Amino acid sequence: MSFGTRLLLFLILTLPLVTSSSPNTLHVSGIVKTGTTSRFLMMTIEDYDDPSANTRHDPSVPTNAKADTTP
């Protein structure tokens, strides 16, 4: 392939990539404005209440688990 053919092929393949990754452009009555809209993700890091004791846990009741499981 000649240099001109390779250059043309390169431009054809890279043009969609370059134009799709550019910021959004707004055309208003012949004036070109380039801008991007910002979005903010609001999140709460305080998902849980203050730590407290488990009211359903009673340590005086034995469990079915064995204390020593070594052979």
Swiss-Prot record:
Its GO CC terms?
Answer: extracellular region
What is this protein's name? Protein PSY2
Q: Where are the transmembrane segments?
A: none
Localisation: Secreted
Which residues, renumbered to this chain, carry the PTM 4-hydroxyproline? 62
The protein's PTM annotation reads: The sulfation and the glycosylation are required for full activity.
Region Disordered, residue ranges: 50-71
Q: What is its main location?
A: secreted
Kindly give the InterPro entries that the UniProt entry links to this protein: PSY
Protein species of origin: Arabidopsis thaliana
Which residues are the propeptide, according to the record? 21-46, 65-71
